[in-house]
Amino acid sequence: MSVPAALRTVTVIVAVVLATLGLTTAAQAATINYVALGDSYSSGVGAGSYIDSSSCKRSSKAYPSLYASSSGASLSFQACSGAKTSDVLNNQVGALSASTTLVSISVGGNDAGFSSVMQDCILGGDSGCKTAIANATDYVDTTLPGLLDTVYRTIRSKAPNAKVVVLGYPHFYKIGGSCSVGLSDTSRGYINGGADALDTVIEKEAANAGFTFADVRPAFTGHEICSGSAWLHSVTWPVDESYHPTAAGQASGYYPTFTAAL
């Protein structure tokens, strides 16, 4: 081989190596480092197919798992059943770092005492439900904003380079729907109103933090309890899965709402 030919061969080899390195670097740079924070609506309670035996009930059918599978994102799945804002701060945000590029979170319902409100509505009739919702709404309006502000500020501090998507909660009932027993439509309306109050505060605080709010209510319209095509469990066993999205609710409600916000 002549010297010029040899030089050309070396040049081609070097170019190929550099191109390969460049592709590798670009792929590494494009890796989505995703941390899923929050409560049972993000962990996937009610969707089944739980990843481990912990009480967090993280599901492979929850929207964080679905997104990681479809996008190839590296997922740190921190969301946990029953989590309040304090649990996010104490047990979850440690997974965040400057290399985190995407964060999702749903939180606030447990702080407002959602499970006890539902119990009061089931056992206390319209009057008891109205009182329970009023008390919860007062908490949501006066106390929850400060708690959310602390959580959101902490997320931004620990993950300064991340896009943050805050997901809300659906309406639970279709008014005038197919249910012939159980709560009255009056109580069902109170419960939906409580979800609206919660989402309003979450949306406002998310905007104040510069985060994106993903409203799941439109996606669940027509798929509430009593709709005949529900993506939410009514009272069921295990009882902690009551009033949580089914696998269909995660796949067709939360997941597309989340991805549309990216």
Task: Identify the residue ranges that each predicted region occupies.
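A short acidic, glycine-rich active-site loop
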Residues: 53-61, 127-143, 186-196, 240-242
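Oxyanion-hole/transition-state-stabilizing segment in secreted/luminal serine hydrolases
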Residues: 87-140
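Catalytic His-Asp segment of secreted/periplasmic serine-dependent ester chemistry enzymes
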Residues: 170-262
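Structural recognition of the beta-strand scaffold that forms the well-ordered cores
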Residues: 33-38, 42-44, 74-79, 101-106, ...
